[in-house]
Amino acid sequence: AQFVATLPWTSTGFAPREALPFLPRMEPTTPPRRFAVLIDADNVSATALTGLLAEVANYGVAMVKRIYGDWTLPNLKSWKEQLLEHAIQPIQQFRYTVGKNATDSALIIDAMDLLYRSKLDGFCLVSSDSDFTRLASRIREEGLMVIGFGERKTPRAFVTACDRFVHTDILRGAAPEDPAEPKKAPSALKLDRKLIDLLRWAVEASEDDDGWANLGAVGAKLMSQQPDFDSRSYG
């Protein structure tokens, strides 16, 4: 049965909406951010892909999903099922010269094309290579968000060039990249002076006049100073 609300009638027509508190007010919704996910297959494990895309979904919608590599090489065969499952477009890039990474160049060229030709809100750059540092900075200069993904060995220059950086070993489905470095125990965290100082600074910088700090504001301060800060890294 279809419910039909009867609106009260006045001398000037139907009653104004303010007189009908039982009707829900339709608030305008903000469309999700549109991201391009560009993956350097040579510098990330296929086991991290499911968790990586789930992380991207926390920020918006992956409108473009491409992965770059020389697919004639046997070491990239592990990607096949993952690409089919997640509808990711593989981009073939042959290695023209030993020691020169043509994959990086192809990814950077595509990123610049997308930057100027597509209506995107941000990029997800998946690599542990410092060659993408300038690309991340250039995208941010255009006012778009950059989220980086990579291993813990990723050079600091690339990490800090991103708005947000996520280590792939903490993503669901990803195997630990360095078993020799387990998560810190609570007792060890108490001795992590750098972490304590960072948290204290973020809280103090976010305090209002009454001495309270909003958690969201604290998180924003942390990201501004350390883009790869992630509570999941500390247990």
Give the location of each predicted region:
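Short, glycine/polar-rich helix-capping loops at beta-to-alpha or helix-loop-helix junctions
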Residues: N75-K80, G150-V159
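P-loop/Walker A NTP-binding module and the surrounding RecA-like catalytic core of P-loop NTPases
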Residues: K65, T133-S137, E142-I147, P155-A157
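Acidic beta-strand-to-loop metal/phosphate-binding motif
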Residues: Y68, D121-S128, L135, I139, ...
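Conserved phosphate-handling catalytic cores of large alpha/beta enzymes
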Residues: V159, D163-P176
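Domain-level signal for Mg2+-assisted phosphodiester chemistry and nucleotide/NA-binding surfaces
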Residues: P21-Y116, M145
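N-terminal regulatory modules in eukaryotic regulatory proteins
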Residues: A180-G235
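Intrinsically disordered, low-complexity linkers and terminal tails enriched in Pro/Gly
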Residues: P21-P32, L171-L191
